[in-house]
Amino acid sequence: MRIGILGGTFDPIHYGHIRPAIEVKHALALDKILLMPNHIPPHKQQPNLTTAQRLKMVADVCSQLDGFELCDIEAKRDTPSYTVVTLEQLKSLHPEDELFFIMGMDSFIQLKSWYEWQRLFDFAHLVVCQRPGWQLDAAHPMQQILTARSHAHQETHEGHAKNTHKNSGQIFPVTITPQDISSTQIREQLAKGEIPVDLLMPVTLDYIQNQQLYLP
């Protein structure tokens, strides 16, 4: 099975998370996508909602989307959500499956600052989402890694038959439709009493309104 993994604070989860995940799922013929809320994001301030509230919102979204499932292993952890620890745990749960960890190009270019980043490739492929026409500068230090581990590059140099059995360690660049949406923007709108109906799935908006979340 080919399993995509999209982690995030999801505070709240919105179409800027969901639409790229759907596009990646189709582009790489993934069997399912795991949406994985963080508990203690190492690179972010603490979230506005409780872990339980964010889990509920993501679970609601997954119930509306075919092939999407909530993954709560980071949310249940009491230590920081380092990706390499999570992927190692997921790989132990899915030893025969291919894992595809989804990130934006903005995260990829910072990858060397991640905890034990080289070991990510031991457990999963990386999917790097990029805007149409955008390319990493040839002189950027991450370009060499992107080129060497590119799925297309390895198929060209190793041959398709050999490559199909590689179930981790590759990078799959995927061009996605730009989504000019941020959780900060949504929280600010809600705090002002505005209803961002175009940015949130109805099930998410219903939960936020019923629970009176993000009010000033």
From Swiss-Prot:
Its EC number is 2.7.7.18. PANTHER family: NICOTINATE-NUCLEOTIDE ADENYLYLTRANSFERASE-RELATED, PHOSPHOPANTETHEINE ADENYLYLTRANSFERASE. Pathway: Cofactor biosynthesis; NAD(+) biosynthesis; deamido-NAD(+) from nicotinate D-ribonucleotide: step 1/1. This is Probable nicotinate-nucleotide adenylyltransferase. Keywords: ATP-binding, NAD, Nucleotide-binding, Nucleotidyltransferase, Pyridine nucleotide biosynthesis, Transferase. It comes from the Bacteria. GO terms for molecular function: ATP binding; nicotinate-nucleotide adenylyltransferase activity. Belongs to the NadD family. Catalyzes the reversible adenylation of nicotinate mononucleotide (NaMN) to nicotinic acid adenine dinucleotide (NaAD). GO terms for biological process: NAD biosynthetic process. It is an enzyme of class 2 (transferase). It catalyses: nicotinate beta-D-ribonucleotide + ATP + H(+) = deamido-NAD(+) + diphosphate. InterPro entries: Cyt_trans-like, NadD/NMNAT, Rossmann-like_a/b/a_fold. The gene is nadD.
